[in-house]
Amino acid sequence: MTSSALVPSSAELCPDRTAEVSRTTAETRITVRVNLDGTGAASLHTGIGFFDHMLDQIARHGLIDLQIDCDGDLHIDGHHTVEDVGITLGQAFARAVGDKKGIRRYGHAYVPLDEALSRVVVDFSGRPGLHLHIPFTAGSIGGFDTQLTYEFFQGFVNHAGVTLHIDNLKGINAHHQCETVFKAFARALRAALERDPRAAGVIPSTKGSL
């Protein structure tokens, strides 16, 4: 068996990892802007306060600059808004990541908050798959339907093209459960998207593509 050299002979310049995606349906109008190499700055307007708080965790703990503006049919409920933000954010990530050359690809994180503990593992595999277990102790948090956590991550996974395992391992307070999930997700993203200086310009797969 023969293998090509892992690292190219000359270093490749790091491409700009930003994206802007707009999505309009009869239910929502959304614009998302991301900078994967940011500082954690966020401007978030979904109309759902607790959801904005969770999205802020992605920005802050992932060191991702994130701007989301959403006008959704909240007079019905938050389902379309939360799901469609996940879809649009996933599309923006896919565009910003590009061909995945030089990234570490895999990331994981454990995050505690008082009694709650969550683990998230992500693989930028190009194969969408969500495996989620969060035994929420309440049906809503500040008007946010906890069932929509699944809808957000399913939308993201399908359009970012990632495999995502989410497990809330412990928790009594539903706010703490949800917050540890989003913080761990952010930290896992940050690890997976970090550029590996020893594999600059190389796609992290023996197949040569992802």
From Swiss-Prot:
Gene3D superfamilies per the UniProt record, alphabetical: Imidazole glycerol phosphate dehydratase, domain 1
Matching CDD domains: IGPD
PROSITE patterns: IGP_DEHYDRATASE_1 (PS00954), IGP_DEHYDRATASE_2 (PS00955)
GO CC terms: cytoplasm
Listed InterPro entries: IGPD_sf (IPR038494), ImidazoleglycerolP_deHydtase (IPR000807), ImidazoleglycerP_deHydtase_CS (IPR020565), Ribosomal_Su5_D2-typ_SF (IPR020568)
One Pfam family this sequence matches: IGPD
Intracellular or extracellular location(s): Cytoplasm
Alphabetical keyword list: Amino-acid biosynthesis, Cytoplasm, Histidine biosynthesis, Lyase
Enzyme category, top tier: lyase
A biological-process GO annotation: L-histidine biosynthetic process
Molecular functions per Gene Ontology: imidazoleglycerol-phosphate dehydratase activity
Predominant subcellular localization, coarse grouping: cytoplasm
Pathway the protein contributes to: Amino-acid biosynthesis; L-histidine biosynthesis; L-histidine from 5-phospho-alpha-D-ribose 1-diphosphate: step 6/9
Catalyzed reaction equations: D-erythro-1-(imidazol-4-yl)glycerol 3-phosphate = 3-(imidazol-4-yl)-2-oxopropyl phosphate + H2O
The enzyme's E.C. designation: 4.2.1.19
Family, per entry: Belongs to the imidazoleglycerol-phosphate dehydratase family.
NCBIfam families in UniProt: PRK00951.1-1, PRK00951.1-5, PRK00951.2-1, PRK00951.2-4
Record's protein name: Imidazoleglycerol-phosphate dehydratase
Organism in which the protein naturally occurs: Acidovorax ebreus (strain TPSY)
